[in-house]
């Protein structure tokens, strides 16, 4: 009888421990994949970039005025709508940079790198919004797993936009959180 109570007590503690661990795991997954996502707040991203990198404002204003800052959308194989900005070099070139943002950021927050490649190095640039950031769809940040396939797809888009003979660099940047 005493042994039976001990087994029941131990089993209850074990089941309770499993439930607590499962709940904590779900919370941590949700916390890491659906954080407060500054990458969805575009206006705040533009303000941050212009405040932090004041040299960007005249360049971006010029791009917008000349309709050189363009948007494009594609669909991933799993039917998620993805967005990117792109800017052609001021001179015809085969050099193209695909500049990818980090965790909880968006393409706008990579414009300082885009400026370097486009304005200083005369590259064509393409800046994608990864899943669940910027203007891209999705219900969770992927932390690189599906993003690697999306970036490959964006490289194909860059080839279509700028020509099949592009020399391409992919730069993935994680600025400080």
Q: Which residues does each predicted region cover?
A:
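Conserved alpha/beta-hydrolase
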Residues: 114-137
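The serine-hydrolase catalytic nucleophile loop
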Residues: 103-117
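N-terminal Sec-pathway targeting helices
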Residues: 1-18
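Alpha/beta-hydrolase fold nucleophile elbow
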Residues: 162-175
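A short loop-to-beta-strand scaffold at the N-terminal edge of the catalytic core in hydrolase folds
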Residues: 71, 77-88
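Short beta-strand element of the alpha/beta-hydrolase
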Residues: 94-102
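Alpha/beta-hydrolase active-site loop
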Residues: 141-162
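An N-terminal hydrophobic leader/cap segment in hydrolases
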Residues: 16-73
């Amino acid at each position: 009888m005493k042994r039976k109570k001990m087994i029941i007590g131990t089993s209850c503690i074990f089941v309770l421990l499993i439930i607590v661990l499962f709940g904590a795991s779900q919370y941590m997954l949700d916390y890491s994949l659906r954080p407060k996502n500054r990458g969805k707040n575009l206006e705040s991203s533009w303000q941050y970039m212009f405040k932090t990198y004041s040299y960007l404002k005249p360049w971006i204003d010029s791009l917008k005025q000349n309709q050189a800052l363009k948007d494009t959308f594609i669909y991933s194989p799993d039917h998620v709508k993805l967005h990117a900005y792109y800017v052609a070099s001021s001179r015809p070139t085969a050099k193209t940079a695909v500049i990818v943002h980090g965790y909880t950021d968006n393409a706008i927050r990579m414009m300082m790198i885009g400026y370097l490649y486009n304005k200083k190095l005369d590259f064509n640039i393409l800046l994608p919004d990864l899943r669940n950031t910027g203007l891209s769809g999705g219900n969770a940040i992927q932390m690189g797993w599906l993003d690697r396939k999306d970036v490959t797809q964006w490289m194909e888009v860059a080839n279509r936009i700028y020509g099949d003979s592009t020399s391409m660099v992919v730069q993935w940047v994680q600025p400080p959180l």
